[in-house]
C-alpha cells in the first residue's frame, strides 16, 4: 500500500487495495470490480497464480484491464517481454500504460493466460507442493524430490491427442503443452515464437521417450529449442483434446486441475492487459524479419 501511495501521489484517481484470503478470492475481487461497469485497472501483485486469478475475474469485461506487479518466484508470463520485463516493477510506468486485448486458454471450463500442460512437467511442478509440506523442505529441493519421484514412477503415460481434428500418432506421450505465452515452470521456454494475441495456441507434444533421453533433451527444451529436437510434434491451432487413461494432474498457469480428459481451446473471452510504454511481446525473430 505504501508503494501505491507513493506512486499515486499528486493524482486524483480513486484506488483501493485488497489482500486475497483464500484460493479463488482474487478472481472474485477482479470480477466484482469489473462488474461495476466503470473503467478499472487491476494490478495483480503476486506470482503467476495471482495473475491467473485476476485475469479469470476480468476476462470478457471490456471496461477492465489487468497487469502484473511481480512478487512471485516465477513471473513467467512477463518473461516474453525480454529485458523489459523488469519495467513491470516500476508502478509509475504502469499508471498510464497502453493496453491491448490478449487471448486466453480455456481448459475444462477454467481459464489460463499463459500455459496449460499435462504430463512429466506438470507432475513435477505441481508435485513439488507435496514435498513443501515436509519439514525443512522448500524451494529447489522440493522440485528435485518431485522430479526424482516422477522419474521413478515413469515419465510417459497413455494419452490420445487430437489437435484441430488431427489425431496425433502415438499412444503414449511424455508431455503435452498448450501455450499462449512463451515461458513456464520458472523459465522453461517451449514456444519461443508464441504470441498471446494471434487467436491461436502453440502446441508442443513430446512423444514417449526413455528416462535417459529426457535427461539429455531437457536443457534444449528449456532454452527454446523444442523445434530442433527430433520427433517432437509442434502445431499451431485453436483447440486440442487429450484423453488420459486415468486422472492426471493438469497445470494451468501453475494452478492444479485433476481430470482424465482435457478440452483445451482458445477462449471466446479476451482480457485487456496493460504494459509499460515501449515494451511488447513480439518475438525477436519477427522483429528482425
List the model feature ranges, each with a label.
Residues 145-148, 157-165, 185-191, 225-228, ...:
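Glycine-rich, charged/polar anion/phosphate-binding loops
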Residues 117, 121, 177-191, 256:
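Glycine-rich phosphate/pyrophosphate-binding beta-alpha loops
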Residues 1-42, 52, 280-289:
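ATP/NTP phosphate-donor binding region
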Residues 26, 48, 176:
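Short conserved active-site loop signatures built around small residues
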Residues 163-165, 170, 195, 205-289:
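ATP/nucleoside-binding phosphotransfer catalytic cores, i.e., glycine-rich phosphate-binding loops
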Residues 132-142, 192-213:
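Gly/Ser/Thr-rich active-site loops/lids in small-molecule metabolic enzymes
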Residues 20, 60-177:
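Catalytic core of DAGKc-family lipid kinases
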Residues 50-63:
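Short Gly/Thr/Asp-enriched flexible loops that form oxyanion-binding sites at enzyme active sites
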Amino acid at each position: 500500500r505504501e508503494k501505491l501511495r507513493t506512486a499515486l501521489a499528486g493524482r486524483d484517481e480513486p484506488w483501493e487495495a485488497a489482500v486475497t484470503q483464500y484460493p479463488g478470492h482474487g478472481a472474485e475481487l477482479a470480477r466484482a470490480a469489473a462488474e461495476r461497469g466503470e473503467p478499472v485497472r487491476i494490478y495483480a501483485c503476486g506470482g503467476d497464480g495471482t495473475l491467473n486469478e485476476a485475469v479469470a475475474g476480468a476476462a470478457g469485461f471490456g471496461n477492465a484491464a489487468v497487469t502484473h506487479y511481480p512478487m512471485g518466484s516465477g513471473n513467467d508470463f512477463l518473461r516474453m517481454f525480454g529485458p523489459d520485463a523488469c519495467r513491470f516493477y516500476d508502478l509509475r510506468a504502469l499508471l498510464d500504460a497502453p493496453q491491448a486485448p490478449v487471448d486466453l486458454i480455456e481448459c475444462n471450463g477454467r481459464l489460463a493466460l499463459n500455459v496449460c500442460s499435462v504430463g512429466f512437467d506438470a507432475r513435477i511442478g505441481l508435485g513439488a507442493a507435496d514435498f513443501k509440506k515436509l519439514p525443512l523442505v522448500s524451494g529447489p529441493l522440493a522440485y528435485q524430490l518431485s522430479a526424482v519421484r516422477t522419474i521413478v514412477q515413469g515419465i510417459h503415460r497413455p494419452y490420445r491427442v487430437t489437435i484441430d481434428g488431427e489425431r496425433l500418432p502415438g499412444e503414449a506421450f511424455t508431455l503435452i503443452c498448450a501455450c499462449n505465452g512463451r515461458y513456464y515452470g520458472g523459465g522453461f521456454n517451449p514456444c519461443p515464437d508464441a504470441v498471446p494475441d494471434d487467436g491461436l495456441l502453440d502446441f508442443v507434444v513430446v512423444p514417449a521417450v526413455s528416462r535417459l533421453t529426457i535427461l539429455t533433451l531437457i536443457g534444449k527444451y528449456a532454452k527454446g529449442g523444442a523445434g530442433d529436437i527430433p520427433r517432437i510434434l509442434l502445431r499451431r491451432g485453436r483447440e486440442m483434446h487429450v484423453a488420459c487413461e486415468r486422472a492426471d494432474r493438469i497445470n494451468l498457469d501453475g494452478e492444479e486441475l485433476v481430470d482424465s480428459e482435457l478440452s483445451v481451446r482458445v477462449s471466446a473471452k479476451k482480457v485487456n492487459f496493460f504494459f509499460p510504454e515501449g515494451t511488447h511481446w513480439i518475438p525477436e525473430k519477427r522483429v528482425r524479419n
